Amino acid sequence: MLSNGSIMFMKSRLFSKRGRAGREGRNRKMIASAENIMEQVRRGPWEPNKQILASDGILEVRVQLADCDRLGCLLEKLEIRPTHGCSLNIDPLWIEKEIHYLGEPLKIIEMEKSQGKALLRSFPPRRENGTVHFFELVIDPGEGLSLNRFSYDRSLGSRTQTPVPLTRETLERLLADLVSLASKN
């Protein structure tokens, strides 16, 4: 005969297994969602002046390319948006810590923690002939995430969006990291 302590131990192990199985199921769904989007992006069209759209019903990914070839591309803009009235819960601290392969580290410039909004920029930015070049990543739970590269000309006092050269491998890694993070909702 089992004692009350043994029964409680067995119940707690059963519930912890159910909780773990639920988490593992959610993790598998998130991974499958990210892999589905990445496969759509890999299929293209990898053509100059094209926009690649991919969606899994929860997330919509847009990649705007100025040019591309078999090795790399000129990325104009990357966006990840929620669909069906969903919102994204993206951790800017994770991005600041993990996305370090763009040549310039991204740092949080502004954050409204209560609203889940954040602005990250290259820090330090690249300076060249009176022009400052930097990445800008904007996070808004309702609007999604956008990554752009800008050039600010101090003499003109204006900034313009500029394409950034990336290898396909770097772009795929960036997309995989951001889609995976956005899929954790």
Identify the role of each PLM range:
Residues 7-17, 22-101:
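Charge-rich, low-complexity N-terminal segments
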Residues 73-136:
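The feature represents the first ordered module of a protein
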Residues 30-47, 103-118, 166-170, 182-183:
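Short, flexible domain-boundary/linker segments around small modular repeats
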